[in-house]
Design a protein with these regions (language model features):
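Glycine/Thr-rich beta-alpha phosphate-binding loop at enzyme active sites
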Residues: 26-40, 203-218, 255-318, 360
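C-terminal helical cap(s) of enzyme catalytic domains, especially alpha/beta-barrels
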Residues: 89-107, 275-291, 350-368
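Glycine-rich beta-to-alpha transition loops that act as phosphate-gripper elements at the mouths
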Residues: 60-63, 166-170, 242-248, 319-332
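Proline-centered loop/turn at the N-terminus of a beta-strand
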Residues: 55, 162, 236-237, 264, ...
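Glycine-rich phosphate-binding active-site loops on the catalytic face of alpha/beta enzymes
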Residues: 76-90, 203-205, 264-274, 327-328, ...
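Alpha/beta catalytic cores of nucleotide-metabolism and tRNA/nucleoside-modifying enzymes
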Residues: 1-38, 105-114, 296-321, 329-368
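N-terminal amphipathic alpha-helix/helix-capping segment at the start of soluble metabolic enzymes
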Residues: 34-57, 147-160, 310
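Active-site entrance/lid segments in N-terminal catalytic domains of soluble metabolic enzymes
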Residues: 29-32, 67, 73-257
Length: 368
């Protein structure tokens, strides 16, 4: 990389304005002045029994509402995940919500939970090179608002496109496991009623400090949640989004616990790390030292986990499939996930910087 290269201007990075609030992006985004790409024709594939034009899509996070889903559907993404919703209103964390990890720290990401440094502007390069860190806290509109918007999003999709709705429980202080399980079950039923074709439960948000952030680490509880989701979702496919599980025995136990209720797992939901500014204090502010890491720096770890989960599913003959997500910014990145055993590949931050990514992938790999 040329040492004289300049960092891109803040606010002109992609469809999500990182210099604006979540509320602004919800009301005014996606902020994209460029053209919508021409989308190549494909023969089509299956995604948990549903016909899709491709097994390429967008993970929970970027698609804030129906307007965002419509834009990315027209750009050629065929599996579209509505940003995580709750059974009650939840405000977003204050700004900043999206920062960029120092390249040296991003390159050194591994199993150790070492702190990383972050700043508002990315270093020189493009979105394919960047590792981001985010801290939103899984905000949600009231159910009446998001259910109507989900219905609108479903109406906007073309044939052979699938709407996934991501849900998460909202435990209050003193809530029991039973109340968390019941909340997930209610949400699955609400998502189904609103028009979801697939229900995804987020068991692993790396940027919240409340109990819903690490449910996937409890295999028995995850199994009970999967059962409640299955009851609420009816015949719809049920996916569980999990975080990084470096211990193979623990991952195997989780897979066995949810098999028979869940249809598959989405692997992985970023890495949780301490995120610091140049002065060594919490980059996102007081009480928000831990945040989610996504983008280039987590790709290798995420592919490895997909491969491990796929091997365990085959070994134990479980009726589960794995959806890969993490650090996909080119066709070669997606190919590594398919080779590792993923049935589909979702993208998180890269489509924000590069909406035409799926169209280029389809041109190279119409079989996907």
């Amino acid at each position: 990389m040329n040492g004289t290269a300049r960092a891109p201007a803040l606010g002109r990075l992609g469809t999500y304005r990182t210099d604006r609030s979540y509320a602004w992006n919800y009301e005014h985004g996606p902020a994209w002045a460029g053209p919508v790409p021409a989308v190549p024709a494909t023969a089509g594939q299956r995604f948990f029994g549903l016909e899709v034009a491709s097994r390429l899509g967008i993970a929970a996070g970027l698609l804030l509402n129906a307007r965002w889903i419509d834009f990315y559907a027209r750009c050629g993404y065929d599996i579209l995940t509505y940003k995580t919703v709750r059974s009650r209103h939840r405000v977003c964390h204050p700004m900043p919500n999206w920062l960029f990890v120092d390249p040296a720290d991003a390159a050194a990401l591994d199993e150790a939970a070492s702190a990383v440094r972050a700043r508002a502007r990315p270093h020189a390069g493009t979105g394919a090179d960047w590792t981001s860190t985010v801290s939103f806290g899984m905000p949600s509109r009231d159910p009446g608002v998001w259910m109507a918007d989900v219905a609108q999003a479903r109406h906007l999709l073309a044939p052979r496109q699938v709407l996934v709705v991501s849900v998460v429980a909202s435990p209050a202080a003193g809530d029991t496991a039973d109340s968390i399980i019941a909340d997930f079950g209610r949400l699955a039923a609400m998502a189904r009623e609103a028009g979801a074709q697939v229900v995804e439960a987020n068991l692993s948000c790396p940027n919240v400090v409340s109990a819903e952030g690490d449910l996937y680490l409890d295999a028995a509880l995850s199994g009970r949640i999967a059962q409640a989701l299955r009851q609420g979702a009816g015949t719809l496919p049920v996916l569980l989004k999990i975080g990084h599980v470096p211990d193979e025995a623990r991952l195997a136990a989780l897979l066995r616990a949810v098999a028979g209720q869940a249809s598959g797992l989405v692997v992985v939901n970023g890495l949780s790390r301490p995120v610091l500014d140049g002065a060594g204090t919490a980059a996102f502010g007081t009480g928000r030292r831990q945040a989610g890491i996504l983008g280039r720096g987590i790709h290798a770890i995420s592919v490895q986990e997909v491969a491990r989960a796929s091997a365990l599913i085959e070994r134990d003959r479980l009726d589960l499939q794995v959806v890969g997500v993490g650090g996909v910014a080119c066709a070669e990145d997606a190919e590594r996930y398919f080779e590792a055993g993923a049935c589909a590949v979702l993208m998180g931050s890269a489509p924000m910087f590069d909406p035409a990514l799926a169209a280029r992938m389809k041109a190279l790999h119409p079989e996907w």
